[in-house]
Every structure is written in C-alpha cells, then in structure tokens.
From Swiss-Prot:
Gene source species: Nostoc sp. (strain PCC 7120 / SAG 25.82 / UTEX 2576)
Bilayer topology annotation: Peripheral membrane protein
Gene3D superfamilies: P-loop containing nucleotide triphosphate hydrolases (3.40.50.300)
Main subcellular localisation: membrane
UniProt-listed Enzyme Commission number(s): 7.3.2.1
Native organism taxonomy: Bacteria, Bacillati, Cyanobacteriota, Cyanophyceae, Nostocales
Location within or outside the cell: Cell inner membrane
Keyword Membrane appears in the UniProt entry: yes
Biological-process GO terms, alphabetical: phosphate ion transmembrane transport
Binding positions (ATP): 47-54
Membrane-spanning intervals of the chain: none
InterPro entries registered for this protein in UniProt: AAA+_ATPase, ABC_transporter-like_ATP-bd, ABC_transporter-like_CS, P-loop_NTPase, PstB-like
Top class in the EC scheme: translocase
GO molecular function, one term: ATPase-coupled phosphate ion transmembrane transporter activity
Full protein name: Phosphate import ATP-binding protein PstB 3
Length: 268
C-alpha cells in the first residue's frame, strides 16, 4: 500500500491528482495515483523503468492526449480546475504547464527565434527583445549567447541547448515546468549547471522532474515520489505509487521497504 504524506503544511497545492488510472487501449499503465504537487517546490519522480513516471508527467500538460490509445480515469486539478474537464483547452494547459524533454530539442531556428516563436504563437504583444533577454537570463544563458542571437540554436553545446529549451519554456510564462530526465544526455558539468538552474527557477516556478539519478533527486528536490511496477497475469506491467514524502525522509527514513531497497541500490 502506498504511503502518501501529502499534507503540505502551509504550502499551496498547485496540482492535485485524485484516483488516476491511465490506460493505453485495454492496457492499464498507471493505477490509483493520489498525489499533490506543492507550489514553488521541486518534486522528483523516481522509480524503475516502466513504472509510469513519464506517463504521469505527461498527464499534467495533456501531452498523452496526442497518443490515440490513451485514456485517463480520475481527476487532475490545476488549483480548482479539472484539467480533463470537457471545457478545458489542452493548448492553454500546455502554455501554463511547460515541458523540457530528455534530449535537447531546439527548433531549427536562430537562438533568438527559438525564444520568440512560442511567444508569438501565444499572442505576446510586449517588447520581444526584452522577453528574449529576460528568458535567456532566467535560464542562465544570456551571457553565453548575447552576441550570437542570430546563430542557429543547433550550434550550441548540448548543455547550452538544454538551457535554451528551458528558456523557450519560460518565454510563454508558464507557472509549472515539467522536466523529463533533462540531464540524461548531458555531461557532468552541464548537468551541474542545469541543477543549479533548477534551484534558482523554483523561486518563480513549480518544477516536477523525472530522474533515474538518485543523487540528482536528492540534490535538487524538496519532495520525492517513488513509483514501482508490478507484473500482471497477462504479461503486462502496472505502475503504482509506493511512497511520497519530503525528499530527506524518502532517502534517510523511508516508510516502505521497497523504497528503502530502491534508494539504497538493492533493486531497480
């Protein structure tokens, strides 16, 4: 049975997941997820491959809707709004809840246009030069690219490209930034820079990060959710939440034996 210590004291809950079940066709991928995401904190999702971490992450900004066989039961609230209500526009959800993917994926455009493109699509009417600079500064990239804004985003190093993607997400003024293993394709120095950036960003944004790196989860997050997977009689695999608590508790004093085994490296 999952341990979900989701009482967040005075911290406001920005995303609330209630009794969520996720299906791909007839296949149950995630079962009975209850989870609160606190505002202006970093929440890490950890667990073995196939346990549904990225699936849940993509439920938050409705990217899974793009998969024809996807179906969700239960509710996910963004404040008081059910994100899966019929009157909710998925495009607006994705503006408010941004996404940074596993591998850097800059648009085939200039550094400047990588930032400006999404803002233009979303009807931004302000000073575009100021928005580009502000977004790049927030992503700790401005000083490195300010003299080459018209160069291709693809000309940057891998770590710079990932920070460009973070700046691109920031430019459309989201409240939440989802990160799906954002450092898995980066070298250790670039990884450290992104981790430092995550600490800075949580002052203004709520961040949810999926990571297979236990040390990274311990370093960057305030709360950690551990997911596991169990086999079915038909050969399938169902992901479920084992334990959710303050990161320090998950790593130093977990309540569930499976959590203790995973964070200590006994399985996974």
């Amino acid at each position: 049975m999952a341990t979900n210590t989701s009482t967040l004291n005075s911290t406001e809950t920005v995303l609330r997941t209630e009794n969520l079940n996720v299906y791909y066709g007839k296949f149950l991928a995630l079962q009975n997820i209850w989870l609160d995401i606190p505002k202006n904190k970093v929440t890490a999702f950890i667990g073995p491959s196939g346990c549904g971490k990225s699936t849940l992450l993509r439920c938050y900004n409705r990217l899974n809707d793009l998969i024809e066989s996807f179906r969700a039961e239960g509710k996910i609230f963004y404040y008081s709004k059910n994100l899966y209500a019929q009157d909710i526009d998925p495009v607006e959800v994705r503006r408010r809840i941004g996404m940074v993917f596993q591998r850097p994926n800059p648009f085939p455009k200039s550094i400047y246009d990588n930032i400006a493109f999404g803002a233009k699509i979303n009807g931004y009417k302000g000073n575009m030069d100021e928005l580009v600079e502000r977004s790049l500064r927030k992503a700790a990239l401005w000083d490195e690219v300010k003299d080459k804004l018209r160069q291709s985003g693809a000309s940057l190093s891998g770590g710079q490209q990932q920070r460009l993607c973070i700046a691109r997400a920031i430019a459309v003024q989201p409240e939440i930034i989802l990160m799906d293993e954002p450092c898995s394709a980066l070298d250790p120095i670039s990884t450290l820079r992104v981790e430092e950036l995550i600490h800075e960003l949580k002052e203004q944004y709520t961040i949810v990060i999926v990571t297979h790196n236990m040390q990274q989860a311990a370093r960057v997050s305030d709360r950690t959710a551990f997911f596991n997977v169990r086999p079915t009689e038909t050969g399938g695999r169902i992901g479920y939440l084992v334990e959710y608590d303050a990161t320090e508790s998950i790593f130093n004093n977990p309540k569930q034996e499976d959590t203790r085994d995973y964070v200590s490296g006994r399985f996974g």
